[in-house]
Amino acid sequence: MKLLEDRIKKDGEVLDGDVLKINSFLNHQVDPQLMMQCGEEFKRLFADQKIDKVLTCEASGIAPGVMTAYVLDVPMVFARKKKPSTLNDAVYWADVFSYTKKVNNKICVEEKLLHKGENLLIIDDFVAQGEAVKGMVNIAKQAECNIVGVGAVVAKTFQGGSDWVKQHGLHFEALASIDSFKDGQVHFGKEN
Amino acid sequence: MKLLEDRIKKDGEVLDGDVLKINSFLNHQVDPQLMMQCGEEFKRLFADQKIDKVLTCEASGIAPGVMTAYVLDVPMVFARKKKPSTLNDAVYWADVFSYTKKVNNKICVEEKLLHKGENLLIIDDFVAQGEAVKGMVNIAKQAECNIVGVGAVVAKTFQGGSDWVKQHGLHFEALASIDSFKDGQVHFGKEN
């Protein structure tokens, strides 16, 4: 998605450790028009699939997730990183390993929000090692849902997450695929 | 907003301790069409104001916040509850007291995302005691922004948060104002 690549080139910051900071339009400040365009692009890329629900993860997945759900006219569920006090019903849990902090965190989704046989599109803002996606796939499988695909706004294809998704037979689409940060610059691949 | 009140009556669950759980369309599963309608209603209610940016708080504020920003055609910033590893620049911090857990949590916004003199519309999903709103007002003041108003998707008007906002001279709007949960039922006030 050229619009997104151009924006990453213009506003993204490459930090040490192959980290891309895009706080000005995705991860802290959000450009809602761009998020809507991402949603429309996901709709186009998964147009051959029946989608009943979008599954994403708080916090940065919510903006692209809700816009994708809006254009698909389906509900969106966001996995929570803590079980809130109002979450008094049974939940599905999954581990999400944090490479930054070297600890297992957990995400959860209330059981009654996912139904057996439902067709889920998983949306994430960033797929690097793909730990959040692995957690969402785990939860979708516990709920016996069908995963119609995984859509990433940005994928760092050299960190294994996108390969993991494809190796598990899932349809993977990234709106911007980053191959490397050689010389402190963002280098895009051909997948978008 | 009658559509929202009807939805709360239909799908909301009143729990002990004057807690309203609306996980099926706002706080865990999200109805994106309803969120867009909330955004349009906030635009109408604050139509007399110049708005440069929407400020909200992760996680449940993001969906109504980004839809409001979409219809206003302005950026949205969500305050973070933890400082992420990529947030390497200076941030504004504010305390947010948790009545459930009796502890002070913190929220933060990167300084360079808020500019002196900018006109901010603060959006929150739920205003009860209003602690998250107080934190966002605090941050907006640190940044020397103008607060053009505070919009709540749902306000529990008997818990003080909406009064606090008005007592501080701020324009307050709630799309659904709950006066009480007498007899385990949701009773709406006249403000919406």
UniProtKB/Swiss-Prot annotation, chains A, B:
Pathway: Purine metabolism; XMP biosynthesis via salvage pathway; XMP from xanthine: step 1/1. Its EC number is 2.4.2.22. Xanthine binds at residues 20, 27, 156. Its main location: cytoplasm. It comes from the Bacteria. GO terms for molecular function: xanthine phosphoribosyltransferase activity. It catalyses: XMP + diphosphate = xanthine + 5-phospho-alpha-D-ribose 1-diphosphate. Belongs to the purine/pyrimidine phosphoribosyltransferase family. Xpt subfamily. Converts the preformed base xanthine, a product of nucleic acid breakdown, to xanthosine 5'-monophosphate (XMP), so it can be reused for RNA or DNA synthesis. This is Xanthine phosphoribosyltransferase. It comes from Lactobacillus helveticus (strain DPC 4571).
